[in-house]
Amino acid sequence: MGKRRAKRLLESYEANGKRLEPGVCVMLRPPSPKTPSYIARIERIESDAAGRVKMWCRWYYRPEESIGGRRCFHGVKELFLSDHYDGCYPEAVEGVCSVHNLKDYAYLDVVEEEDFFCRFEYNASTGMFAPDTVAVYCKCEMPYNPDSLMVQCEDCKDWFHPECVNLPSRGVESMKDFICPDCS
């Protein structure tokens, strides 16, 4: 039996003009042009004896790819970090992206096409999430969605969707003080 040649770990690799290294999030070309890019985090990059390079990636899932599907509180740019790993080739990289935590994403002045956020880890085989509970807001008791406008009560400091407290959406951002129905 022949000796198996060792693979060599690479600190970084350049593909399509992009510097790739462990920890970097990438957008990967899907099989169909109608499908959005796949998003993954590079865990390691290795080269075999013939010089072929392969990245080991941890996948992010979109809500609609999970067992529970997309819910109304999921943001448009929301992803779940999964326990699903695969080998990928650098040639499939379309670009580099940023996957922020929810708090950092909410404070972005401008959300670019390459910006995403993640607040859950997802076990692809069981369909379970971590954390399995999340804070809820408003009278509707829904988790925070950065795509939905909310207003804070000056007294109790709770957050509300304008439509849930009978406020017109227009002009809410310029309101000086808001007092919720429970505090007024």
Where are these regions (language model features)?
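Short Cys/His-rich metal-coordination motifs, predominantly Zn2+-binding knuckles/fingers
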Residues: 140-145, 155-156, 164, 183
